[in-house]
Amino acid sequence: MIPIQWKQNDKKTMHVNEAENGVVYLTWPAIEKIEGIRHAFSTRIGGVSKEHLSSMNLSFSRGDDPANVRENYRRFCEAAGFEVENIVTSDQAHTTKVRYVTKADCGSGVTRDRDFHDIDGMITDEPGVVLATFYADCVPLYFVDPVHRAIGLSHSGWRGTVHKMGQATLDAMHERFGTEAKDVIAAVGPSICQECYEVSGDVIEEFRAAFPETLHEKLFCGKPDGKYKLNLWEANHQILLAAGVPEKQIHLPNLCTCCNPDFLYSHRASKGKRGNLAAFLSLV
């Protein structure tokens, strides 16, 4: 197993699972405890893709041989307990658009073409539908409403975060299912940490405008060269708190993609030569 660098105090916040077929994937202890939920977050380990895509690339848009990507999906689903034909993938464009998906959408982006575009978040209350979103530094957001038996999964880069994708997903779940934030178990998945995430002043100005001044010190810090270090984990944490999700029901990753480039794909660490990780969430 490749050594994993956890962040604060080397605290292992996620379970590292190694399947019999060699696939390694991550799960949240808090979500594992919820009856009728299956979830996972992929790593680079256990696939067939080569070179900078090695080996569990789950994207058809990174220049990989499509046959390799299909085999990776087969292996991953065998390991984590999903059905390939039931996966519905997002079409990410750094929006805050959230789509309600059903069994009619199953296979979208994997076994057949999608019939929707520019969707960064998905919600469902239909068992068997497997939501899947893609990453290589951006933030995965998992939402489970055990009261209404509903789930949501969203992609939130800095643009999605500054426009509060977490709030948008909770709003969509409330409108569709009656979800109350106080009932939701939420998780911020593996993504780039503040130490690794340098951004320009233009980005920080958007965060200054979007978040109360009392939070600025928690969210970003300046560098002597005029750049800033941005904390997407804390920004999404604060968005979820402000939306009404209780502190004890919000789970942060403590695992940085950029700090672990041999274990997880990172756009920053690889200078763009990388595959894609994926988050998965379904009702069973």
Residue ranges, per PLM feature:
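Active-site microenvironment for binding and transforming phosphate-containing groups
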Residues: 1-284
